[in-house]
Amino acid sequence: MGMSKSRGCFGYPLSIFFIVVNEFCERFSYYGMRALLVLYFRNFLGWDDNLSTAIYHTFVALCYLTPILGALIADSWLGKFKTIVSLSIVYTIGQAVISVSSINDLTDHDHNGSPDSLPVHVALSMVGLALIALGTGGIKPCVSAFGGDQFEEGQEKQRNRFFSIFYLAINGGSLLSTIITPILRVQQCGIHSQQACYPLAFGVPAALMAVALIVFVLGSGMYKKFQPQGNIMGKVAKCIGFAIKNRFRHRSKAYPKREHWLDWAKEKYDERLISQIKMVTKVMFLYIPLPMFWALFDQQGSRWTLQATTMNGKIGAIEIQPDQMQTVNAILIVIMVPIVDAVVYPLIAKCGFNFTSLKKMTVGMFLASMAFVVAAIVQVEIDKTLPVFPGGNQVQIKVLNIGNNNMTVHFPGNSVTLAQMSQTDTFMTFDIDKLTSINISSSGSPGVTTVAHDFEQGHRHTLLVWNPSQYRVVKDGLNQKPEKGENGIRFVNTLNEMVTIKMSGKVYENVTSHNASGYQFFPSGEKQYTINTTAVAPTCLTDFKSSNLDFGSAYTYVIRRASDGCLEVKEFEDIPPNTVNMALQIPQYFLLTCGEVVFSVTGLEFSYSQAPSNMKSVLQAGWLLTVAVGNIIVLIVAGAGHFPKQWAEYILFASLLLVVCVIFAIMARFYTYINPAEIEAQFDEDEKKKGIGKENPYSSLEPVSQTNM
C-alpha cells in the first residue's frame, strides 16, 4: 500500500475537497451534455422521436454497463487513482469530440445553414458518446470509494458526512448544468449562418470535465492510494461457476443434496467466501425487478423532454426551455432528501409503523408508477390542443388571398369567399382521390380559373391567390408542431421584384414575386427583421418587429405595398402556439422524485448493509447494472411499441411498474434481514480457534446514498 501523509481541515482529510470539487464538475459535465442529447439528435441530426429515444437510452445503458469494466480495471490492474485519471482523460476527449460534431460549419461547404454531410456528424457523435460512456461509467465505482479510502479509523462520522456532501455535489452539478446548458443551446452562433448553439452548449461541459481532471490531479500528493488487491468480482464469478458446474457433475441421486446450491463449491473454496457470496446473491435476487423503476425514471431526459416541447414554457415572468424542466428533479432532490430523512421517516417511526428498507423501495416503485399516470393525463390534455395534420391519403389546403379583390375558391362540395388580405380560418382536409377540381372566381371579373396542380398527399399546402387568373400553390413543409418549442416564420412577397429578409441572424434570400419562402425557426420573444428591396423609396421604413412569439407556433408574414407606397407586413397564423403550460409537468416530477428518494437512496443503503465488507464493489456494480437494464427495457418498448398515442405508452409503463411493484413486495415479504458483520465476526472467531487468524485482505467500500452516480 502506498499512501501520502494525510493533511486535515475541520476534521476532514484535505484530499476529500479535491474529490468533491472533481465530482461536482464531472456531474455538471455529464448531465449538462445529457440534457441536450434528445433535442440534438432530433433537431440537428434529423432523427425522429423513436430513434432519438432509442439512441439516448442506448447511451445511458452503456454508461451503466461500463462500471463493471471500471471496477475490474481498478481492482486488478491500475488501482482507483490511476483508473480515475486514465478514464477521465478518455471522458474529456469524448466530450470534446461531441462538441466538434455539433459544429454546423464543419461540413456546410455551400453555407446554406445545413450540414452537407450528416454521416460525418453522426459518426463523430457516436465516437464521442462511446468515449463518454467508457469514461463516466468506468470512474463511477471508483470515485466515491476512493473518497472513503481517505479517512482514518475512528473517522466514521466524518466519512458519513463526506458522503452526504458528495451526494449534494452530484445534485448541485446536475442542477446547475441542466439550467445553464439549455440556455446556451438557444443562443445563435455560426461562422456563415446562425443556428442553435450546440457547440457552445456541449463545449462548456467539455471544459468542466477538463477542470474536473485538473482538480483531481492537483490533489494527487495528498491522497491515500491503495494498490490493487485482486479482483474480488472475478473470484465471485469463478466460485459461482464452479458451484454450478460441480452441481451438474453430481446431479445423480447417489450424491446427497446440499443445503444451498453454492455449497457445491466447498471442494475448492473456503466457507467464508461461500457465505459471503450467499449474502450477495440474496440481494442480487431482489435486484431482478428493479430495472423497471429505472426504465421509467430515465425517461425524464427523453419522453418527458419531448412532451415539454409541445407545451408552453411561460410560468409567470419566467420562461423555461423544454430541456430545463429536468432541473425540477434536481431541485426537489436537494430539498426532499433532508426533509425525508429528518422529518418523514421519524414521523412514520413515531406512529409505530415498521417502515423497513424494502417497504420504502416498494413505495418508491408505486410513486414512480403514479408519476407516469399523471404524465399520461397531461399528454391527453396536450393532444386536445394539437392541430390535426393530414393522413397518408389526405391533403390539407389553406387559401390566402393576397390580392386587392374578394376571391371565391370552389372545392368539391364547398366554397370559400375571402376578402382582400385574409385567409381561411383553418386548413381544409380532403381525401386525395376526391379532390377532383378547384376553381377560382371573383365577383369583379368574368370567368373561372381551374387550379392545375398535383397536391402531394400527406402534406399541407397554401393556395396563394391575387386575382382570378393568377395563383400559386405552396407546399408548407410543416407536418407537425415546430420542434423544441420554437416558432416557424415564413414570408410571402406580393411585390413585383425579389426581396431578401434578415431576421435574428437568419436570412430568407431572394424570395421571388408572389411566392413564399420556406419556414425558419426561432425561439420565443419579439424578433427584429429587415426587408431589403429597391421597390420602395429610400425614405421608407424597412426595419420591422414581429409579434411576441410564444412556443410551438407558425406564422406567415405577407409583405405588401401600403397606400403611401412604403412597405407594410401582415401576420397570419398557420399553427397556434402551445397552450398547455409546462407547470403541469411539476406533479409528475414531484411524484417521480419522491419515488427516487425512497427507492434509490434506500436501495443503496440496503444493499450495502446486507453485503459483506469485501463485496460492496460487487453490489455497487450490480446496482448500476439495474440502471443499464432499465434503459434497455425502454429501448425495446420504444422500438417495438409504435403507439398511435403517446399517453398509451405512458400507461403501459405505469402498468408494468405496478405489476413489478407487487412482485417485489411479495419477494420482500419473504426476505430475512442479516447482519454481515456478525456473520464475518463468527468466522473470525472460528478461525482464531483453529489458529488460522486470517485477515480479510479486501477493504470495504462505504455506501453512498446518491441516485445520480
Swiss-Prot record:
Query: Which stretches are Extracellular in the membrane topology?
Result: 22-53, 104-118, 183-198, 298-327, 383-585, 642-646
Gene Ontology molecular function: any one? tripeptide transmembrane transporter activity
SUPFAM superfamilies documented for this protein: MFS general substrate transporter
Q: What is its main location?
A: membrane
Organism in which the protein naturally occurs: Mus musculus (Mouse)
Protein name per UniProt: Solute carrier family 15 member 1
> Pfam families from the xrefs?
PTR2
**PANTHER family to which the protein is assigned, alphabetical:** OLIGOPEPTIDE TRANSPORTER-RELATED
Catalysed reaction(s) here are: a dipeptide(out) + H(+)(out) = a dipeptide(in) + H(+)(in); an L-amino acid tripeptide(out) + H(+)(out) = an L-amino acid tripeptide(in) + H(+)(in); L-alanyl-L-lysine(out) + H(+)(out) = L-alanyl-L-lysine(in) + H(+)(in); L-alanyl-L-proline(out) + H(+)(out) = L-alanyl-L-proline(in) + H(+)(in)
Tell me where it resides.
Apical cell membrane
The organism's place on the tree of life at top rank: Eukaryota
* Transmembrane in keyword set: yes
Q: Does the keyword Membrane apply?
A: yes
Enumerate the UniProt keywords alphabetically: Cell membrane, Glycoprotein, Membrane, Peptide transport, Protein transport, Symport, Transmembrane, Transmembrane helix, Transport
Region feature Disordered, mapped onto this chain: 690-709
Impact when changing D550A:
Reduced trypsin-binding
Q: Tell me the protein family, please.
A: Belongs to the major facilitator superfamily. Proton-dependent oligopeptide transporter (POT/PTR) (TC 2.A.17) family.
NCBIfam families to which the protein is assigned, alphabetical: 2A1704 (TIGR00926)
